[in-house]
Amino acid sequence: MAIADVFDGVRELGRRARGSYDNANLWIGPELRESDDWHDFLQSAHTAIDALDQADKSVDALVQAVAADKPEVVVDLGDISRRLHELAENLKLIIDGSDEHYVYSLQVNRRLRAGGESMTAERIDIGEALANEWLPEVHTAIFASATMTVSKSFEHFNHAVGLDRIGASTSSSLHLDSSYDFDSNMAVVVAGDIPDPRDRERYLSALERVLVDAHLAMGGSVLTLFTNRRDMEDLYARVEPKLARAGLELNCQQRNSSPRRLRDRFINEPTSSLFALKAFWEGFDASGETLRCVIIPKLPFSSPTDPLSCERNLREDRAWARYSLPEAVLEVKQAAGRLIRSSTDCGVLILADPRLVTKGYGKKFLTSLPTTSYQRIESAQIGHYLQLWRARHERRR
């Protein structure tokens, strides 16, 4: 009963989360810890800790009582005791909140009436832990990836894995250009006239036109990567019927759908297209004619209410530029990497976020892409541009 009261309390606290859709993710920061709601929650949390400690003691006593007669159950009872102790210690860690190595948060699945609650203590600086506990014990470590640099700089990666804290003489870096001819095989289009997302109807209407025109011009084989489910589902409802009338199949990563099945269908149906979320931003391979166009409607910045972002902003003045910006750049690089998977692949990357040309940080994204040039095109002209691009590349074959 005591533990159930804790989860009920977590669900009540989750009501404070703003801007959430199905899942509330709430930072347990100073404002929350000073609230009446938190103080009410502490009562049930302390009661639960006492109950867990008492249960742990009872299990230990049972181990002592049965060890001689039933040694076969001692291991199982020991596992139970360890779990009870870990639960109590983890709950103490979170409600105390004084260990600055962690950021604390709670999560609630709003689609469930009960059973979708959790509390988390997440290490805020993995690089520090690696530099102190792992890297000194390693004789040689090699990090290799196509998406480690931001504008050809390793600064963000080195900080993330702790290399900037073990001395410059102990590590070295090397940036190698790809053997693929990205300038010939990959086009980057920036639609800089998409309305502000806060004007939702104009924003969705403009994106709808871009998406319909792009799919029709490319004849399918388009992967559109969204940052949130609401935009994806609203645009799918608008775009799918129009594509269906043109004989083009469009699938969508619905709730509880299998990413593997969506991937297999996308690969097996060469002209099908897909609206997808996080699972398809990286690690998705569809070479050749299967994938000819990737569309990113919005840059994948973390939410300003994300607990890790909130904690970093509290501790550092320029946290957004140091963490959120390079992380978003790397995600776009990962998404762009879906297009060119072999030396013969070709395709178009469409970036439909006007911040790429209206904000100074837009250059970070564009200079981090594998191709050295991009086209800024009005959204109404994207369909025509793609028709010309497709005709030109089909003549080259």
Model-predicted segments: where are they?
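ASCE RecA-like P-loop NTPase motor cores
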Residues: M1-R397
